[in-house]
From Swiss-Prot:
This is Regulatory protein cro. Residues 8-61 form the HTH cro/C1-type domain. Cro represses genes normally expressed in early phage development and is necessary for the late stage of lytic growth. It does this by binding to the OL and OR operators regions normally used by the repressor protein for lysogenic maintenance. GO terms for biological process: regulation of DNA-templated transcription. Keywords: DNA-binding, Early protein, Repressor, Transcription, Transcription regulation. The keyword Transcription applies. Residues 19-38 bind DNA. InterPro entries: Cro-like, Cro/C1-type_HTH, Lambda_DNA-bd_dom_sf. It comes from Enterobacteria phage 434 (Bacteriophage 434). One of its GO terms (molecular function) is DNA binding. It holds the Pfam family HTH_3.
Amino acid sequence: MQTLSERLKKRRIALKMTQTELATKAGVKQQSIQLIEAGVTKRPRFLFEIAMALNCDPVWLQYGTKRGKAA
């Protein structure tokens, strides 16, 4: 099962975005993206903004499931 950090990094790379580009689009610091991808930050406060910048569901990004689906 993938972690939040793995899903975020995989999605960012699929969109051919750098951490800096994602951070700018989401309105957060690049270091915040780096800490999430490193697995240091488990529950980012700007999860919704990051998910919108990645054009994905925030529930999927956090938990790896779609809304209403059990893991």
